[in-house]
């Protein structure tokens, strides 16, 4: 598991970094790539079929992102993020890889949605939880024009059963609120 996770993290990092060429100014063409960092607050809980109530876990997330323009309004945004999830007294820490399709409005606002795969890296009891968590992410963000700084609000809706020790299906559900910075936001970085 750890060997596979190291390979996957390395692969995603290589994809985000390789192929970056020259910086130019102007509108972003297809293939324009911007790298960034992000971090913020998580508010997560576990939802299950038996409606057992869990107290919310407030944690944090921290990660890297790649912003790949398809044209002036559409982009893909793959990310590599550490995320503290689960619920109070049920700590589940993941490395998440969301791949979002993003629509960019001319005023700096963006809407986004896409799948996310999470790899459990630590928990209170590893034997009780599945190592992979699939989710759907939807959200909005705002980039301050010509600065690269932005704010992001996202909802992550767990799709897969995180509980492997019971017949009761349990999923992660959470809201993330945070800040991000896109390096070289004023310039184009074109893939060759």
Pin down the residues of each PLM region.
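Predominantly the C-terminal beta-signal and adjacent terminal strand-loop region
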Residues: 25, 131-192
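Cleavable N-terminal export/targeting peptides
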Residues: 1-31, 184-192
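Residues that define the transmembrane beta-barrel architecture of outer-membrane proteins
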Residues: 31-33, 54-60, 91-95, 130-136, ...
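Transmembrane beta-strands of outer-membrane beta-barrel proteins
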Residues: 33-37, 76-78, 111-115, 149-153, ...
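Transmembrane beta-strands of outer-membrane beta-barrel pores
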Residues: 41-45, 82-86, 117-121, 144-146, ...
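Short glycine/proline- and aromatic-enriched beta-strand/turn motifs that initiate or cap beta-hairpins
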Residues: 24-67, 192
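Outer-membrane beta-barrel channels and translocator barrels
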Residues: 30, 69-73, 106, 145-147, ...
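Glycine- and aromatic-enriched membrane insertion/assembly motifs of diderm outer-membrane
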Residues: 34, 51-94
């Amino acid at each position: 598991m750890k060997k596979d996770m190291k390979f996957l993290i390395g692969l995603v990092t290589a994809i985000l970094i390789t192929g970056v060429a020259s910086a130019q100014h102007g509108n972003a063409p297809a293939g324009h790539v911007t790298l960034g960092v992000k971090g913020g607050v998580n508010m997560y809980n576990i939802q299950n079929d038996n409606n057992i109530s869990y107290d919310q876990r407030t944690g944090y997330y921290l990660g890297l992102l790649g912003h790949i323009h398809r044209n002036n309004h559409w982009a893909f945004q793959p990310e590599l993020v550490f995320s503290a999830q689960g619920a109070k007294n049920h700590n589940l820490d993941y490395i998440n890889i969301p791949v979002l399709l993003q629509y960019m409005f001319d005023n700096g606002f963006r809407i986004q949605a896409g799948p996310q795969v999470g790899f459990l890296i630590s928990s209170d009891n590893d034997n009780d939880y599945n190592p992979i968590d699939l989710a759907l992410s939807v959200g909005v963000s705002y980039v301050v024009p010509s600065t690269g700084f932005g704010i992001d609000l996202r909802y992550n809706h767990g799709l897969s059963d995180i509980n492997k020790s019971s017949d009761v299906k349990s999923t992660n559900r959470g809201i993330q609120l945070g800040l991000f910075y896109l390096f070289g936001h004023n310039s184009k970085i074109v893939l060759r």
